[in-house]
Amino acid sequence: MPVITLPDGSKREFAHAVSTLDVAADIGPGLAKACIAGRVNGELKDACDLIETDAELSIITAKDEEGVEILRHSCAHLLGHAIKQMWPETKMAIGPVIDNGFYYDIDLEHKLTQDDIDALEKRMLQLAKTNYDVVKRVVSWQEARDTFAARGEDYKIAILDENISKDATPALYHHEEYTDMCRGPHVPNMRFCQHFKLMSIAGAYWRGNSENKMLQRIYGTAWADKKALSTHLTRLEEAAKRDHRKIGKQLDLYHMQEEAPGMVFWHNDGWSIFLELERFIRRKLNQYTYQEVKGPLMMDRVLWERSGHWDKYSEAMFTTSSENREYAIKPMNCPGHVQIFNQGLKSYRDLPLRMAEFGCCHRNEPSGSLHGLMRVRGFTQDDAHIFCTDSQVQEEVSACIQMVYDTYATFGFENIVVKLSTRPEKRIGDDAMWDRAEEALKQALRDNNIEFTILPGEGAFYGPKIEFTLHDCLDRAWQCGTVQLDYALPSRLGATYVAEDNSRQTPVMIHRAILGSLERFLGILIEEYAGRFPTWLAPMQVVVMNITDKQADYVEEVVKFFKEQGIRASFDLRNEKIGFKIREHTLRRVPYLLVVGDQEMENKEVAVRTRDGIDLGKMRLEDFATKIHQQISLRSLKLLEE
């Protein structure tokens, strides 16, 4: 007689084994209709799975994030069902859930077109609207293999042969005549899967290996209701307008080319923004008392072996050789910073020692994963490492948290999600060390009034970690900042200091990044601002335009004055109508468009308008320069107003 404990603490006793669906029905018909799955003793289970002993149960519905993920996974199976009806010869590979949706990789000789995708979507909806039940069967490994062998599903057989133990009992999910294999859970009925859209087609190698066959990957998105789907599609339309690759080209910020995949060619205006970001972070480093250092771009393989990176990271490292020595181009800065720390004897009085670098790093990311500035092979980290004692960890982490929030607020990011990853099963050190480390991070977060979620077991083997994920204007999540404790690397590379009792001790190392990759963060900013950078970041802050040739000399005089004031200014003396010039520079997203006619020239003034079309009237040069300087010094996100 299992006793089921619900989230509110209430208990229900049953005379026999029950499923989540049975419990939901016992509570009420509305909940039974909404039930998608259950979380039984912390583990997600299908709604039909029997609970035979006392258990804690949470009933999952489409209102829960987990419920939406489950219906997305079931939509992948629905896609498989439709594909096999339309092209029975298709061989199905894998169909996982991804952010906001799902995909399925298929082996089909026919090359799918957009018309095919539209037809597939229509067939999926027809199938889902029949509201058929999804039937789960748990079978032996051999029965699962025989089932897929009879259907010619070579990829499912490969998964069974290579990834699943012969002692296992795989779950098969039957969608009428279509059968798929999955860990689950899945929706009990396809009425939950009626708000979806197929988004695109791409190529994908089986198992991500370019030596394997290229498959066709169909991407889709799925949501709990029509409104959520519509909202998501609207956001995607807005995201497409804000795509940093498109805006980067329009504004002539940067380019990339095949001869240097994943490497950025910065143009003048893009590099101007990059340098402004760097200057801003450099001021923060000075404010928080960091040393700025610069390490070599590549180091001998021996050092990477000692640090442990060679064993765990060598596939992602670019290497070269010279004079019978093998070198690796650095994928990260930390081993180099330990080498700088090791120069000269350090005392406990020297700690904490905060070391920062704008480190140029390279990682051999798969070519298929490269995406504009967001995923590159060559990038600059605003990386820092703090060497400190155990007793200093909490205070140092607290300062890092303040620095992260100060920085993000400057760019207008206020919705920050914080997660704390704690000790994994395989780890160095004893429980007492981990207790101190985790408590120090928790207390630092509490001291800053930061709400956080704990991710049990997700920390690195060498220490716990805090992750900062910012949400942009389209509510997309970008994980940028990290604060990571490291109790391993200083020891591996021989870092020590002389303690107060004259003993040699190993410092704790705190890895700290705020923007992460400057390239990626700049890509995020391009999309956040849609290219309309605040004045302090804008590559060109002011453009001055004449109405006739008569004002040309005065325009040049005005621009010279602004440049002497440290304002990024240019002129447009082309023999074009002033309306044409204004439109062109508005499209370039220049914050301030200054027009000069005879009257302005005579009175030593400029007529000021913003890129938003707001007419600010006439101003004396000194007055306008003062207002702009104030905007820049405050790093205001807004332009001047009437």
Swiss-Prot record:
One of its GO terms (biological process) is threonyl-tRNA aminoacylation. Disulfide bonds: none annotated. Its cofactor is Zn(2+). It is found in: Cytoplasm. Keywords: Aminoacyl-tRNA synthetase, ATP-binding, Cytoplasm, Ligase, Metal-binding, Nucleotide-binding, Protein biosynthesis, RNA-binding, tRNA-binding, Zinc. Residues 1-61 form the TGS domain. One of its GO terms (cellular component) is cytosol. Binds 1 zinc ion per subunit. Its main location: cytoplasm. Homodimer. This is Threonine--tRNA ligase. It comes from Shewanella baltica (strain OS155 / ATCC BAA-1091). The lineage of its organism: Bacteria, Pseudomonadati, Pseudomonadota, Gammaproteobacteria, Alteromonadales.
